Amino acid sequence: MHPRLSPTVRALNAAAAATLLLGLAAPLGAQGAVDPNVAPRAAELERIGERQLGTEMLGRYLAVAQSDGRAWFLLARFYRLDARDWHRSGHRTSPDAELYLALSDVAIEEAVKLEVDSAPLYGALVAVDRALVTIEEQGWSHLAGSDVLPPLPPMVLELGRNLVANCPSGGVILAGSELEGVAVWYGVMGPGGRSDLLPVRPDLYAIDGRYRSQTARALGVSDSLGIRPALAAASAARAVCLTPNADSTLVPDEQPRIERLVRIIGPGDVPANAGLGFTQLVLDQETGSSVWSRDVLSVYGVASRRNPLLCRSLASVAGVLPGGACRP
């Protein structure tokens, strides 16, 4: 569990948290048989707007069938969605995001133990979400050197380092997808990361007053500004960098300069040691070991279509880049 969780949440071990907060009617008992139909039924409930019923179904089921990794993973996803809804509601609902994310963490740890392919990356997403709660409560400066991040799949970790490598010192960086977002977060906040950069979530800035207030303070702008004027004001003094899939309409109407994977608005020079690495990407193409290969390749493909010079560095994987990138 995360070291900054409240004492009450830290005191709950996995079994107690599941029993108390999933609303299980039955105590944890003997291991039951895995039913492959439960997770799809719960997912369908969520699809039709009955996530709470799906959560209760999974809770009762996992109390007796604790070896179903897919069900644990789906339960983690449901609790993370509950935390997202808490932000969107203006923090007016109960429980709060901290508790939902603690429960998501419990569930994803079980999914990791059961070797669900996507679980490690999802655990990283939950860790980022916990950090966002800390930002809202205590500000960006509280994060410096204080986070212990769970492991990230090596190819995604490499992607994050590549995405942040060419953003000028002191810049702001915007991601365009969850994959890019978690990769950038690790590239900034992880060991040896670009801690001089500020990874901003435009979607959260638009809907969450607490996040907007703390992030506007870090940007040095008024929190009365929307995300686009806030970034325009910030870009007068610092670079604003966009990952390959980031929305270009969020930044001022000027032609960005392209530096390898990122587009840049505003001042600042690219760090002198800003090399890119593709060791994990190439290794994965040889072994086929990562379920995230297609998504990571898609990011590089988008960047290569915008910046054909990248194709030289990506020559060894050019044949598998999507959308015709790097092909004659």
Locations of regions flagged by a protein language model:
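Bacterial N-terminal signal peptides that target proteins for export
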Residues: H2-A16
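Bacterial N-terminal signal peptides
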Residues: N13-A25
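Sec/Tat signal peptide C-region and signal peptidase I cleavage site
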Residues: A26-A30
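ER/secretory pathway lumenal C-terminal domains and tails of membrane proteins involved
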Residues: Q31-G170, V182, G187-P328
